[in-house]
Each structure stands twice: as C-alpha cells, then as structure tokens.
Amino acid sequence: MQTSNTDYFFQSTAQLENAERKRLKSKNSNGEPIKLQSKVLAIAADPTRGDAVFLAESSGTARRLVLETGESAAVYKGPTAPLPCICLSTDGSTLYAGCWDRSIWSWDVKSRKPGHKFTGHTDFVKAVIYVNSGGRNLLISGGADADVIIWDVITGSRLHVLKGHTHKIQCLAADPIARAEGSPLTIFSASSGQGIQSFSITPSLGDTVLSDPFKVHETSIYKIFFDEDGDLWTASADNIARCLTRESGWKSETALEHPDYVKDIVVDEARGWVITACRDEEVRLWDRATGELHHTFSGHFEEVTGLLVLGSKVISVSIDATVRQWPLDPKEIQLAKAAEKEKEAGVEPAPEPAPESMLTEEEERELDDLLNDS
C-alpha cells in the first residue's frame, strides 16, 4: 500500500498491517452503527425512555442518543477534556459525568444547562454513581488519585473523603441485596490493583470504613456488575471475566477467558446471557448457566469500552466512535449467525469514512493509557 501520509514512515510493518486491517473492518455495517465524531468512553440508560441512551465522549461532550433514529436528542457541553464515566439521578432529571479535568460536571437533562461542578479529586475522575442512603441522595465518585468522595447533590459540597485505596479506582457499584434488606448502603470498588473492597455508608458518614481487599484477579479490574441474585461479575486486564458468588464469600465460580483485556460485563437476566466487551474489538455472548461462549458479535474496529442491556438488545460503544446494537433473542442470534456466513462470501458497500479524532496525538496517547491502565 502506497501513501503520502508521513506518519506511515515511522510505523513498523505490524503497525501498518493492523492499521490497514482496521481501515477495511471500518467499512462493515454490523450492529447498525451510529457514527459519532469522537470516541465513546461510557454509556448509561435513559431512565425516562427505553429507546435512548446517554453517552460520554473523549471530546468532552455528553449526549442523549435516540437509538432508532440515530438522532442526538440533546448535547451537553462545557468540559474540554475526555469524560470516562457517566450516570444519572434516579428520576433522570440530572446528568453527571466524571472528567479528566479532575471534576464532575452536571447538567439539567431537559434544559441542558450546567449545574454544580463537583471539585475535589486531584486526578482523573474514573467512576461515578448516584445513590440514595437514608432518604438522602448522594453522588459517589472514584478517581485516579485512589480517593472515593461522597458528595451532596443539592449543594455540590464534599461530605466525606474515603482514604485507604492503594490503587486508582476503576469502578464503583452499589450492593442491591444490602439495600433491599434494609441494611446500610454498601458500595463495592474495583481498582487498578488486584482486589475489590467495600464500604457501608452510615448516617454520620464519618464512621465509613473501607474493608480489606479480596483478590480475584492478577491485575486491573475495569468493571464490576451486580446481577439480580446479588452475585458480582468482574471484567479484568488479566483477560478473564469472573462471577463471584455471594454465598461462597465472593469466590470465583465462573471464569470466562478472553484473548485480551475485558473492558465491561453485563448480564441479560431475561435470557440467561452474560455479555462481555473486549479490547480485541469484539462483543461476546456467553451462556450464563454453562459458561460456554455462544456467539461473538464482530463489528467494532477499535476497543469496545461499554455495554448496556436494553430490552432485547445489548448496546455497545467503542473508541471507534460508533454505537452498535446486537440481538439477545435466541432466534435473532441464529439469524445473525446466518447473515454473517452470507457476508463472508460477499463484499459489503463502503460506508462513510471513519470520523477523525478530535484529540491531539499526545492526548490520544494519554487516553490510551487511561483506558488500558493496568
């Protein structure tokens, strides 16, 4: 392949071949891609409507996307640095996004006007969740500074800073069983270390104590996800996704092996699937009961960064700047398999060129380090 792009002269043969592979793969229309202008780093459900999602992007933009039409129903601006995490208030009225600028931005969903800007972390904000404890709505964030901060959503002030983590926080998740049984709200945290820790939020907040970590992986844990049974699913840079059962004291009962970093994991309760996102660009569908790989959805041409089960589909987002939708109904999956075989014998029409990055070369390297921090 001949090119006038001087960047090619500084790349190895393997790098050039990989770039060409991605260029060719970017032409596919698998998963009905919705194309955006910047890398998608996180996804969250819209609590008020089932056909829309919220996205956090590397450009510093958050948006509300209607999946059926591909229309951006609302765009939320202000940050000038990437947004690695996103969440909404329980009633869906307020949007929150953690940012590289060490703060958490908020917007009124309907008016798109900025709200409180939560400042207090000393490094990237990598995880943010909205919870209710004792009748009080709280925002909880985790950062690359290894701190967990509890915020007052009304005033935007810090209520408590939880120290004790020794590694960068990657993910936070609220324990649904403790909350349902009336016990104090318990939050689990995963980090760039090897373990998972937890803490219960007491009325005074000052009594909040971090548990000792329990080791389940060999390196960074990118995502933790509670299923309806209260068991904990994990995704890690050691190329394994695990199910840690509550009854066993959080021991691994299921291990799903991948060829590369596992970036996200979700469970489809209705149909018994476990879905994983991988750095190798694939979305994998596993049988929850047997732990066997059932199908691989191939379409993204860069790392898959997030997943969301929405009705009978799983939505995936990627740093290839696309949002894709994959079927979860067994009959539709069989049709997808058949269609995939047919495409292997044909040539797909070339779509629009992949959008160019809005980040500088240095920012691209920093973003890659952030996404694959192990």
Please provide the spans of the model-predicted regions.
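Terminal intrinsically disordered, low-complexity extensions flanking WD-repeat/beta-propeller proteins
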Residues: 1-24, 261, 292-296, 301-374
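A short helix->beta-strand "capping" segment at the edge of beta-propeller domains
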Residues: 10-39, 69
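WD40/WD-repeat beta-propeller blade-loop signature
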Residues: 30, 39, 49, 72, ...
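WD40/WD-repeat beta-propeller blade N-cap
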Residues: 33-40, 76-83, 118-125, 163-169, ...
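Loop/turn segments within WD40 beta-propeller blades
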Residues: 43-50, 69, 86-93, 111, ...
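Structural hallmark of WD40 beta-propellers
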Residues: 50-54, 74, 92-96, 105, ...
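Short coil/turn segments within WD40 beta-propeller repeats
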Residues: 59-63, 81, 101-105, 123-126, ...
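Short loop/turn segments that connect beta-strands within beta-propeller blades
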Residues: 67-70, 109-112, 153-156, 201-205, ...
